[in-house]
UniProtKB/Swiss-Prot annotation:
Belongs to the SecA family. GO terms for molecular function: ATP binding; protein-exporting ATPase activity. Gene3D superfamilies: P-loop containing nucleotide triphosphate hydrolases, SecA, preprotein cross-linking domain. Its EC number is 7.4.2.8. The keyword Cytoplasm applies. It is a peripheral membrane protein. This is Protein translocase subunit SecA 2.
Amino acid sequence: MIPSQEYRKSVVHQPENVPSGFRGATHWLAGKVHRRQSKQQALLEQAHTIHTAAEAHRTLSLVDLQAQLLSFRDHFRRRARGYEQHISAAMALIVEASHRQLGLRPFPVQIMGALALLEGSLIEMQTGEGKTLVAALAAVFLGWSGRSCHVITVNDYLASRDYARLEPLYTFCGVTASCVIGELKRPERQRSYQAAVVYVTSKELVADFLKDRLLLHGVSDPSRHFLHSSNTLREGDEVPVLNGLWAAIVDEADSVLVDDAATPLIISRPVKNEPLMEACREAVRLAAKLQPTLHYTVEERYKQIALTSEGNATIEQMLPTLPPFWHSATRRNELLLLVLNAREFFRKGKDYVVSDGKVVIIDEFTGRLMPDRKWQKGTQQIVELLEGVEPTDPVEVAARISFQRFFRFYKLLCGMSGTVKGVTAELWHIYSLPYVAIPTNKPSRRTTQAPEYFLEKGAKYAALIATLEALHRQGVPILVGTRSVRESEFLADLLRQKMLNFQLLNAIYHKEEAAIIARAGERGNITIATNMAGRGTDILLEQGVAALGGLHVLLAEPNEAERIDRQFYGRCARQGDPGTSYSYIALDDRLLQRFFPERFLNSVMAEVLLRRLPGSHALMQLLVYLAQQMAQRMAYQQRLSLLRRDEQLDQLMSFAGSGPKF
């Protein structure tokens, strides 16, 4: 490969700063234009034309079909004049190739989705509509470019599964494909990343990106990495594994680009820091003597804690027995507030679990265990001490980057999800991703029951179990959704008391995730799941279950993002199947407790529900809506603030001549 080709493949796109002010207003207007209905209708009409053209290719021999595909591949790789005009003709051949190689004939709506991806859009397709195949149709085109296309999946299982299923199509179309999973060693990763289409999780991809940056020995501008490699690498030296960041198709895009956006991926190494460990132990011991309300106040809504005058006085009285370090008010308050925050806001079974004597973080939005993720600045050690496990050594950060910053490096970014509505403005503002809604192939047959509201959780769970028992007697499969491991375990205990058999899927019992979710559509099955609920794995109905009404999903508590509720409801009624969704909400649910005064909920709203006043359900629905809107607005502002700080730091580093830091 000649140097210019090598450089082109390894260069990284440098994004502009997030628009603000007048530029932000014009950018917002541009997003409105991109979302116009006429554009979506034009894509659907083009898709129907392609679907009709593909039917005419049924008579082609396998040899002729492949010959025409390879001819288009060469044409697109050369980017010959007018190549865009041939997208429809080439797509029709790929549709036929999919039917021959996979036994799957894409529907017009799937073709529409692929066309939208090629335009760099974010598409919303409902669960079960075949997003995996949609990504493959687009990936063939992007693979023909001669540069790598990364297909981002939720976990290693899906990366391996999708690659194995779709590899025959890629090979037939003259496109190399591979997958990168956690168990691969670095030489294997380098070979895999050379493929035209690479299936990989965001975690593995970003970690490899950071490790590549560390190999550059201070050359932190990614676009200069080839020049550094050419002039400094010797035979036998470790080399970067990535093949540039050109195109990415992100599955479950709302989870990756929004929920995980501000999460930093960190390359770190443990370091001994005995003074910090001793300070954490002393802080935990002191905090044990402090009581809420008397010594400190708790602001649940903003997750803030403040010491009272009584609290400060109590600490002052302890000073003579403490080491000199504690005589600094700033230092001791910082450590004590860390302990109090961990004690008041970090919940075992919700934020973390203790497994094999270790504190393991749970992802807030997916419910998955994150064994490689650690809290910073002493928080990890404090939680470990509070749980009575051996504290781990603190870590020294070698490199870090947030997911939202990383994905802005791609020249062509596109994605798909079943739950995009609600974050379309943010995705346009941060990533310049226009939104395209893809219609369902068949009309939805989901029945949505009106939400049920209760004064407290005890009554809510009693009603949920009563509904579950009635449905179980009918033989229908049932999926119960919870927000936390603790809640899922609590419901599991209730079902054990009722002598009901069930499957439990949460961060503790996660290894059989795909198998558990796949069986959730069998007659009479009861499945309890946290938010991890098998995104990317279809729930297929057992024969005869559709006649009973299909899968019934029961949501035990509203999430902070309404789209996560919708994602859970979307587990039922796929591809025209019947299904029913239920939701249960209590005044003492965490969402309402966080955003509304306790006195208002326990007096005014309790009285409204107790008396069943007219409009009480509409008022409760409004409260849930407002709470979810406030939660998402706060989360968005935090993500935007983090990105702006990153941009300011880049500008300072560039001014100093050292380029962006990772």
